[in-house]
Amino acid sequence: MGVTVENISAGDGKTFPQPGDNVTIHYVGTLLDGSKFDSSRDRGTPFVCRIGQGQVIRGWDEGVPQLSVGQKANLICTPDYAYGARGFPPVIPPNSTLKFEVELLKVN
């Protein structure tokens, strides 16, 4: 259980976010059956959040710091690292494993 990071393309290999950093990310979130439930790319605006502070799901708080700037990866988050038994009705069913294709654009 947890988060698995599957590399798609390398980043700079030296600029990694630390807890409390603001990160700018593009992402596409899907269920394991491939159904898309959210996408910053579709909105045309990257997502900005503070990492490691509980502002996002645990899978992101633990997975994003493993990425360096410019890296693209899949974060596979088990339910306990995503939305758990509640899910996020109506788009994410209870106990769903989620896949996020994430690109770390910037760390401040």
Swiss-Prot record:
<comment type="similarity">
    <text>Belongs to the FKBP-type PPIase family. FKBP1 subfamily.</text>
</comment>
<protein>
    <recommendedName>
        <fullName>FK506-binding protein 1</fullName>
        <ecNumber>5.2.1.8</ecNumber>
    </recommendedName>
</protein>
<dbReference type="InterPro" id="IPR001179">
    <property type="entry name" value="PPIase_FKBP_dom"/>
</dbReference>
<dbReference type="InterPro" id="IPR050689">
    <property type="entry name" value="FKBP-type_PPIase"/>
</dbReference>
<dbReference type="GO" id="GO:0003755">
    <property type="term" value="F:peptidyl-prolyl cis-trans isomerase activity"/>
</dbReference>
<dbReference type="GO" id="GO:0005737">
    <property type="term" value="C:cytoplasm"/>
</dbReference>
<keyword id="KW-0963">Cytoplasm</keyword>
<feature type="domain" description="PPIase FKBP-type">
    <location>
        <begin position="20"/>
        <end position="108"/>
    </location>
</feature>
<dbReference type="InterPro" id="IPR046357">
    <property type="entry name" value="PPIase_dom_sf"/>
</dbReference>
<keyword id="KW-0697">Rotamase</keyword>
<comment type="function">
    <text>PPIases accelerate the folding of proteins. It catalyzes the cis-trans isomerization of proline imidic peptide bonds in oligopeptides.</text>
</comment>
<keyword id="KW-0413">Isomerase</keyword>
<dbReference type="Pfam" id="PF00254">
    <property type="entry name" value="FKBP_C"/>
</dbReference>
